């Protein structure tokens, strides 16, 4: 991962491959953002005019490269768009800074060192810039020959990106205060969160032949040991003994057995406890209700919820948050075979309720149901589950926004605010009571399907049935933004995105501070 430093050095004398500056979109054309004064001065105050001549407007995500002025030790200036120029005395939007830093980091793949002269009015700005560039520098090429060649050429720690270039090796943030505790803390937080989010991306991007439930559980065990997190793994025998019918039913058709992983981070100063529950379908074929052909290769991402939960728990431990956080990873592979669960089968869940399976491709809610009930037994102050659950949510909110449902409006609002503060687009969704009747079953206590319209909300209502009485709960349906099938943008790569990690970490921080809901 890119090495970060805070520097008080002046841009002209800094040895680097490039100087990154910000450009805002003003009413009369592009304007040079604070932090780039030395660069602008070297252009005799005409940098904005030069950029406009080159076609730059300051639009968000725009990247323009130009030769550095005479006397600069860095040969190139990289101007990144920050979007609309803020009003007088107002700072730049944190997400605009985050995305600009990410876009610059992507543009600088292959560079050894870059200096970022972006607006750092306060420590929080340093944190979001650091987070953006660390996330933007991410790449996943472990399975490419070009990656192996680049690794051998640049050393064991190098990791190539798609064009054979290693990610930006080092970044110096100019204008920060290296000795200021607030700045140091902001950088440390950004580093921990970004590293764990990138770990979640790695898991989502890993081919399913290398990441089955057992392999995922092993990754969690190794990380738990490294960071002092207690871990418990229930294998098939333990799941049978415990009566986890939902997880077992989903995994019944696969040669790779299911797992339920419990990660427990505890703080001696904690006054609150949270449980995060993640859907971890390491590959989703749909089971007997087989998915149609087309884009099935992306179904490796159906464990993105579990990856987000795993990353968030580890990040909480690394940050030493004063809150107890338990992560539940419900891991299974949904495959068709002679032993697979059939439409019409009835499963007895861990809670004791029975579920009639009308569609085996509505499997995520089955593994989550068992994990939610297991999490409820610890009586946490709140539970949040994360899942790539329904295509209906994608139709409702698109590919970049996830939906939030909850059994408490105030808690739903608090989670939504945490998502916004983290830079993760989300939207509150209802749980209409009239939709519950559609899941009535003549055979079992409830069916795993209901009305076709409002399918994302129906799924939320199903999950609510398995949350312990009196426990505050929220459900994040991340089906849209969990996997980016388009081109990279800002700090978001193609493939796994790590959606919801930052929201969960922010929720944990708020709980630790006694400010959640």
Swiss-Prot record:
Gene3D superfamilies: Leucine Aminopeptidase, subunit E, domain 1, Zn peptidases
Domain of life: Bacteria
Any one GO cellular component localisation term in the record: cytoplasm
Record: residues binding Mn(2+) 2: 279, 284, 302, 363
GO MF annotation terms: manganese ion binding; metalloaminopeptidase activity; peptidase activity
The protein's required cofactors: Mn(2+)
Localisation per UniProt entry: Cytoplasm
Binding, Mn(2+) 1: 284, 361, 363
HAMAP family: Cytosol_peptidase_M17
Family: Belongs to the peptidase M17 family.
Biological role: Presumably involved in the processing and regular turnover of intracellular proteins. Catalyzes the removal of unsubstituted N-terminal amino acids from various peptides.
Protein's UniProt name: Probable cytosol aminopeptidase
Gene from which this protein is expressed: pepA
């Amino acid at each position: 991962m890119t090495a970060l430093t805070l520097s008080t050095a002046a841009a002209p004398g800094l040895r680097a491959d490039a100087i990154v500056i910000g450009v805002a979109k003003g009413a009369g054309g592009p304007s040079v953002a604070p932090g780039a004064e030395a660069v602008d001065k070297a252009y005799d105050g005409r940098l904005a005019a030069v950029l406009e001549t080159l076609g730059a407007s300051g639009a968000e995500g725009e990247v323009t490269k130009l030769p550095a002025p005479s006397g600069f030790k860095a040969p190139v200036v990289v101007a990144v768009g920050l979007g609309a120029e803020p009003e007088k005395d107002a700072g730049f939007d944190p997400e605009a800074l985050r995305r600009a830093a990410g876009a610059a980091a992507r543009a600088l793949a292959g560079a050894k060192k870059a200096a970022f002269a972006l607006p750092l009015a306060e420590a929080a700005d340093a944190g979001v810039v650091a987070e953006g560039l660390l996330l933007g520098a991410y790449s996943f090429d472990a399975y490419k020959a070009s990656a192996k060649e680049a690794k051998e050429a640049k050393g064991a720690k190098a990791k190539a990106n798609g064009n054979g270039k290693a990610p930006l090796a080092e970044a110096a943030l100019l204008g920060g205060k290296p000795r200021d505790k607030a700045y140091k803390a902001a950088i440390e937080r950004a580093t921990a969160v970004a590293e764990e989010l990138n770990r979640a991306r790695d898991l989502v991007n890993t081919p399913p032949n290398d990441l089955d439930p057992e392999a995922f559980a092993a990754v969690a065990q190794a990380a738990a040991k490294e960071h002092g997190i207690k871990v418990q793994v229930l294998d098939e025998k333990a799941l049978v003994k415990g009566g986890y019918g939902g997880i077992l039913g989903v995994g019944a058709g696969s040669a790779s057995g299911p797992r339920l992983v419990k990660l427990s981070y505890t703080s001696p100063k904690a006054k609150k406890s949270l449980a995060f529950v993640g859907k971890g379908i390491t590959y989703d074929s749909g089971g007997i209700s087989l998915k149609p052909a087309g884009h099935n290769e992306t179904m490796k991402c159906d464990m993105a919820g579990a990856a987000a939960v795993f990353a968030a728990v580890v990040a909480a431990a690394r940050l030493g948050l004063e809150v107890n956080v338990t992560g539940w990873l419900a891991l299974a592979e949904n495959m068709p075979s002679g032993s697979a669960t059939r439409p019409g089968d009835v499963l007895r869940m861990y809670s004791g309720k029975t579920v009639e399976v009308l569609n085996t491709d509505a499997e995520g809610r089955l593994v989550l149901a068992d994990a939610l009930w297991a999490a409820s037994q610890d009586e946490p102050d709140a539970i949040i589950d994360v899942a790539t659950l329904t295509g209906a949510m994608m139709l409702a909110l698109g590919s970049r926004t996830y939906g939030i449902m909850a059994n408490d409006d105030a808690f739903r609002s608090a989670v939504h605010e945490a998502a916004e503060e983290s830079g993760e687009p989300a939207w509150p969704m209802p749980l209409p009571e009239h939709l519950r009747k559609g899941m009535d079953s003549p055979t079992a206590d409830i069916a795993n399907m209901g009305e076709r319209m409002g399918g994302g909300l129906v799924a939320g209502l199903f999950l609510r049935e398995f949350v312990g009485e009196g426990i505050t709960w929220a459900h994040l349906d991340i089906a849209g933004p969990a996997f980016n099938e388009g081109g990279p943008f800002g700090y978001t790569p193609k493939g796994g995105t790590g959606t919801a990690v930052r929201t969960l970490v922010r929720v944990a921080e708020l709980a630790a501070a006694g400010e959640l809901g």
